[in-house]
Amino acid sequence: DYIKQMDKDLVSEISYESQINMNILREDEDGKVSILDTSTINLSSYPKDNGQETYLEKNYELLYGYYPTNKNEVVLIVDEKNRLDTNILNALGIDVKKNKEIKFDDLIGKEYKIILNDEFYKKQNGHFYVDSSEKNLKKLYNSKNTITISITAILRAKEDSNLSNLPEGISYSNELCNYYIDDCRKSDIVKSQQDSNYNVITGQTLKNSKNKEDEIFEISGINILNNVNQSTTKNQMLSSLGASLLPSSITIYPKDFESKSDIIEYLDNYN
């Protein structure tokens, strides 16, 4: 609410981003399908485009491939020395051998499948579960209802950028993020979780969701990170199911340099 009350003459646009858990499958060269460990690949979303130059074009150098042209194209962020943690590469299905240099061409075009909640989770005896058998994962991977995403660009943060705060790993558009969240909110497992005070997967009782939410803002340039202490609550469970209720970051685009100073002053007065 505090952000929304800001003088609109200072701001050209405000972008809300959410970090969510996605159901993603990968297929290895031998045809084996497995669930991708999204916590390992540092999944993140980048802000919506603002003006003619996109967020990625303005803040990240294109090393290989091309900037995304639609919501199903994702990017791979590397560090200032073009390096990437081997755990990320392994999770993405890239064969990593000791002291072996990975070519950009090995990464561009890699495809993964996002599985929507109603196909991923099955209900039995009042609880939900994931059938992770090889046969079912293969069936899910080949389903016509999947969202196919592909890596189209290798990017590195520009040295002079104040807003290049994406972690090394896979980053997807805010458009894809919102599409996924909207679908998750309509899914059976999320509706069931909203109506239950226990974890609909494990059956464990959830902690009180009415605890005061402590918001912490950190300013990086004009980017604000919003971390909410949710403990093990219903909100946290819903977020893990893709139905994010709160943004993980808010990016404010000032109209000009003077407006930026006024915005920072306004944010400094929070609390």
How would you label these PLM feature ranges?
Residues 1-271:
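Basic-flanked hydrophobic alpha-helices used for secretion and membrane insertion
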